[in-house]
A protein has these predicted regions:
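Short hydrophobic alpha-helical segments that form membrane-spanning helices or hydrophobic packing faces
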Residues: 39-40, 141
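Broad hydrophobic/π-residue packing in well-ordered secondary structure
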Residues: 42, 82-83, 129, 149
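Hydrophobic alpha-helical transmembrane segments and immediately flanking/interface helices
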Residues: 119-143
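Membrane-interfacial helix-loop-helix
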Residues: 1-23, 45-113, 133-137, 143, ...
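Transmembrane helix boundary and interhelical junction motifs in multipass membrane proteins
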Residues: 27-39, 64, 116-126
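Hydrophobic transmembrane alpha-helices of multi-pass small-molecule transporters
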Residues: 33, 62, 150-154
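Helix-capping/transition residues at the boundaries of transmembrane alpha-helices
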Residues: 40, 128-130, 161
């Protein structure tokens, strides 16, 4: 995360506020809120600002993934150049879906809420879409999971559990 912060300070800091940068980092797949909170801490933002902007950034992509990813994948799957990537993404997401498929709501909460590599809102929304979990149920589970991940990452980055 240090390299992301250094890159930001050497260029985009002139045009993008720290808060917006944290929000943008939190929107990225794989990095998400987990990275956004760490970046906020490195940029010396308050815990309140870190939470607000990383939560907003992590939540923004979720409805789009839940509502449109299956259609986008259906459209891209037959293409020569992107079909393989789509199949690879689907296979990777489904390989992590066992706990979610067994206990839909709580499985999704746990999957999104435990900040481990390859988990989070993006992958959780992708799995929920591929398993055809009801959008309202998936949204609630993912939001709860994101809140849990935010709590854990805040404790690690700002407080009790320093790593």
């Amino acid at each position: 995360m240090d390299s992301i912060v250094q890159w930001y300070q050497q260029g985009p800091a002139r045009y993008i506020s720290k808060q917006v940068f944290v929000m943008l980092v939190s929107m990225l797949p794989l990095i998400e809120l987990r990275g956004g909170i760490v970046v906020a801490r490195l940029l010396k933002l308050s815990l309140g600002q870190a939470l607000i902007f990383s939560l907003i950034g992590n939540i923004i992509p979720i409805p789009f993934i839940l509502l449109f990813i299956n259609r986008i994948f259906d459209w891209l799957r037959p293409t020569k150049h992107l079909g393989g990537l789509v199949r690879k993404m689907e296979a990777r997401a489904m390989s992590k879906s066992e706990s979610v498929s067994r206990a839909e709501f709580w499985g999704l909460v746990g999957f999104v809420g435990i900040p481990l590599p390859g988990t989070g809102g993006w992958t959780g929304a992708l799995i929920a879409s591929l398993l055809k979990i009801d959008v309202k149920k998936a949204s609630a589970a993912i939001l709860l999971g994101i809140a849990i991940a935010a709590t854990i990452m805040s404790l690690i980055s700002y407080g009790v559990f320093h790593m």
